[in-house]
């Protein structure tokens, strides 16, 4: 399978716009693309110009992917179908899949790529697009961007590679059985975009928060099998790396705060808040 570099193109949506797609039957299979990133509360260490992954204390879902997963679960509950959770990366990413299974994902797919941090965005998109096609899904949910890179290219890139319609900045998706309607922000408030499969939805923060697993869900997730696919299994040529990151650098540390005690310091505190912090 040879997947080519996606063509960059702009899509402008208007209220009640219908984008034609190709239907693949009544059974709905939703592929949810998930990325494991350092938790927003985890301390990041940089050694030799690279993030030290061994020092990351906690890994979690990329936040926008949580909205995509929860929206897929709600669509499954209202319209039926099944959810295939797909992630690409090293072995530690399997925990992410089990977390997805604990809240309702039906099939778990781990695309094994220990060196995925050496891939550029297009290589990752080629990998994910091949996994989506192998899964048989005609509908794809993902976050609008990853919390670690903020690239925002996965949704449009995968859509281009699999020949699907793409709607970005989505907050909600519904289905009437014959197509899908996505809600997204507009200059006038909100707009509804109607599409048919195959289609890709890239989610912004929506009206729903990620549900928490119950004990039964957690126990069942531990037993659920994970399908592991290699790059060779997918039969895809991901191409050469076209973008190399020279180095990472942490932000400058904030200066230590100042502490004041006693009534005699009130005038000093007020002066600093007014003249330095500009908050009063």
Please annotate each region the language model reported.
Residues 10-27:
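Short, Lys/Arg-enriched N-terminal segments with co-localized hydrophobic residues
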Residues 24-280:
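N-terminal glycine-rich FAD/FM-binding segment characteristic of electron-transfer flavoproteins
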């Amino acid at each position: 399978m040879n997947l080519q570099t996606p063509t960059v193109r702009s899509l402008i949506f208007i209220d009640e716009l219908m984008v034609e797609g190709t239907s693949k039957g009544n059974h709905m299979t939703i592929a949810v693309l998930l990325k494991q990133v350092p938790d927003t509360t985890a301390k990041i260490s940089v050694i030799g110009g690279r993030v030290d992954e061994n020092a990351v204390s906690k890994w979690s879902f990329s936040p926008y992917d949580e909205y995509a997963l929860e929206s897929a679960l709600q669509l499954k509950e209202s319209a039926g179908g099944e959810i295939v959770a797909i992630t690409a990366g090293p072995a530690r990413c399997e925990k992410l899949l089990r977390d997805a299974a604990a809240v309702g994902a039906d099939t778990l797919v781990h695309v094994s790529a220990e060196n995925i941090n050496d891939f550029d965005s297009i290589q990752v998109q080629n990998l994910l697009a091949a996994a989506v096609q192998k899964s048989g899904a005609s509908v794809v949910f993902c976050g609008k961007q990853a919390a670690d890179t903020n690239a925002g290219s996965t949704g449009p890139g995968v859509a281009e590679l699999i020949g699907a319609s793409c709607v970005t900045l989505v907050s909600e998706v519904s289905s009437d059985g014959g197509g899908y309607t996505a809600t997204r922000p507009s200059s006038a408030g909100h707009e509804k975009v109607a599409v048919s499969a195959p289609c890709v939805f890239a989610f912004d923060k929506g009206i729903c928060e990620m549900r928490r697993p119950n004990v039964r869900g957690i126990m069942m997730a531990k037993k659920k099998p994970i399908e592991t696919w290699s790059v060779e299994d997918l039969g895809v040529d991901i191409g050469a790396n076209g973008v190399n990151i020279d180095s990472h650098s942490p932000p400058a540390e904030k200066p230590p705060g100042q502490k004041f005690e006693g009534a005699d310091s009130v005038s000093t505190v007020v002066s600093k808040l007014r003249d330095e912090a500009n908050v009063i």
